[in-house]
A protein has these predicted regions:
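Active-site-adjacent mobile loop/cap segments within catalytic or ligand-binding domains
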Residues: 79, 303, 313, 364-466
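Structured segments of extracytoplasmic/periplasmic soluble domains
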Residues: 59, 72, 78, 135-137, ...
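Short, solvent-exposed loop/turn elements at domain surfaces
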Residues: 78-79, 99-100, 242-246, 424
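Signal-peptide-cleaved, periplasmic/extracellular N-terminal interaction regions immediately downstream
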Residues: 2-8, 27, 46-232
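Bacterial N-terminal signal peptides
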Residues: 26-42
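Flexible glycine-/small-residue-rich
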Residues: 71-73, 92-94, 134-136, 158-161, ...
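Short, low-complexity intrinsically disordered segments enriched in A/P/G/S/L with frequent Arg
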Residues: 2, 13-18
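Catalytic-core regions of hydrolytic enzymes
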Residues: 196-358, 369-381, 428, 437, ...
């Protein structure tokens, strides 16, 4: 029996595992399956919640360089400068270091007067750092803009020189000191090439030239009588930079048309023996409305002309118009609509409302403007009559509305709508260089006719005989 019992003991099933051991095996099996499922899923980015910058743009100008960073959400940022060498640091919080930021370095132009280059990198977790290498000491400003007119959230960096350039004032000082030769005019005109149809350009065209001042006297210019002084005309090409203005159906941007026509107008005014012209902008960059007026005042301008090619709700709207400032409201619904649209240029182009500018308060004050408005209506009528020989007139009289850019209390000012870029036929005309020449001829003839009947009274500081 003992041997049988021993055999039974050797052949019986193994003892069962304890309950806790069986649970551990099941848990291990489930964990293995879960790990396999996780490995099969697509990888999730480590910084999935970071803001993706959609585009970057750089707008170099004689007065300042603007860098725009556009994104679907507002970006928190920190700005400071470093010395030895001169650098500007912009830290972006919660932003991904993506292609748009890495491409920023390639958008800095060698002719930029203030920025030499830029480097982008991950400074620490959650912070992307942009380091701008500078050519001079600067006074930077950074501010944000809410979405408007097809743009998303924008972080705007304006790089101003520590000592602002003022070529117009420098010219005045040279004249007071006895220097007779005005600075040379730009040698090449900027073409009005067909712009992209999108509101936001990928890489803005860069064509930096010195800020336009009074041009050199042409060799064949006849002498002026001793008591006749120069008549200074400030020409303001509407829009520019971040603000494309109206856009035609073929993709033509107003800012390019206005600059091209203004340059042609300047050439014709400078060819007159008793006239000189200054441009508020000479390239594709943005200037706030009040600074356009301030540039004209610094030049001691006798006349301010803002050139536009606007749009209306209906594409059938057509014809040329001339506007002057109104103290009592707009003279028509269209005039009110156009004035609101032009006055919104600062919102689209981007103005730092956090900076208290004394010039802004000064130029937007409606002082005693009755006499100035009367002169504006006179010159506007003269120009409108001449333009009627080139294009159909939208209205046969000068309209009035509250255009902010016309609020210089001491300079007769008009705003010219050369045509409606929203009208396909007129858009084609506006793109035609010959039609632009005819418009410029008509405008300068209207200016000459006005000053022939209304010569400027007080001698201008800038008008000593050359």
């Amino acid at each position: 029996m003992s041997r049988l019992a021993e055999n039974l003991r050797l052949t019986r099933p193994a003892a069962r595992l304890p309950h806790t051991s069986r649970f551990s095996l099941k848990f291990l099996h489930a964990a293995t399956l879960l790990l396999a499922l996780l490995c099969a899923l697509p990888a999730t980015p480590l910084h999935a919640n970071e803001i993706q910058v959609s585009s970057t743009r750089v707008w170099p100008a004689p007065d300042y360089t603007r860098v725009t960073i556009e994104s679907p959400q507002a970006i928190r940022h920190t700005l400071f400068t470093l010395d030895n060498p001169q650098r500007l640091v912009l830290d972006l919080e919660g932003v991904a270091l993506n292609t748009a930021l890495n491409e920023l370095a390639g958008k800095i132009n060698a002719t930029d007067p203030y920025v030499k280059g830029v480097r982008a990198g991950r400074f620490k977790p959650g912070v992307v750092r942009l380091v701008f290498d500078l050519k001079t000491q600067v006074k930077p400003e950074a501010f944000t803009l809410a979405p408007i007119a097809g743009y998303g959230h924008r972080l705007v960096l304006d790089v101003y020189p520590l000592t602002p350039p003022d070529p117009l004032l420098a010219f005045l000082n040279r004249r007071e000191a006895g220097g007779n030769e005005p600075p040379a005019a730009p040698t090449a005109a900027e073409p009005a090439a067909a712009p992209p149809s999108a509101v936001t350009p990928a890489t803005p065209p860069v064509a930096l030239k010195p800020e336009a001042t009074l041009p050199s006297k042409p060799a064949a210019r006849p002498p002026r009588p001793g008591n006749e002084r120069l008549i200074i005309v400030a020409i303001d090409p509407g829009h520019g930079g971040e603000d494309p203005g109206a856009i035609g159906r073929a993709g033509t941007q107003e800012k390019h048309i206005t600059l091209s026509i203004s340059q042609k107008l300047k050439e014709r005014i400078d060819a007159e023996p008793n006239m000189r012209a200054v441009l508020t902008r000479t390239g594709d960059y943005f200037i706030p409305l009040h600074m356009r007026v301030e540039k004209a005042r610094r030049a001691k301008a006798d006349l301010f002309i803002s050139v536009h090619a606007d749009a209306f709700i209906k594409p059938s709207a057509n014809g040329s118009s001339v506007f002057a400032l109104s103290e009592r409201g707009a003279t028509s619904v269209a005039a009110r609509w156009l004035a609101k649209r032009e006055n919104d240029a600062d919102l689209i182009g981007g103005v730092n409302i956090g900076v208290k500018d004394p010039h802004l308060r000064q130029t937007l004050l409606d002082l005693s403007q009755t006499a100035t408005i009367n002169d504006s209506l006179k010159v506007g009528k003269s120009v409108l009559q001449q333009m009627g020989g080139v294009n159909r007139l939208h209205k046969n009289h000068v309209e009035q509305a509250g255009f902010a850019v016309l609020k210089a209390p001491d300079i007769p000012s008009i705003l010219i709508e050369t045509a409606f870029i929203s009208n396909p036929d007129e858009e084609r005309k506006l793109r035609d260089p010959e039609h632009q020449n005819r418009l410029a001829d008509a405008i300068v003839n209207g200016i000459k006719a006005y000053f022939a009947k209304n010569p400027p009274l007080a001698p201008a500081q800038v008008a000593n005989s050359p």
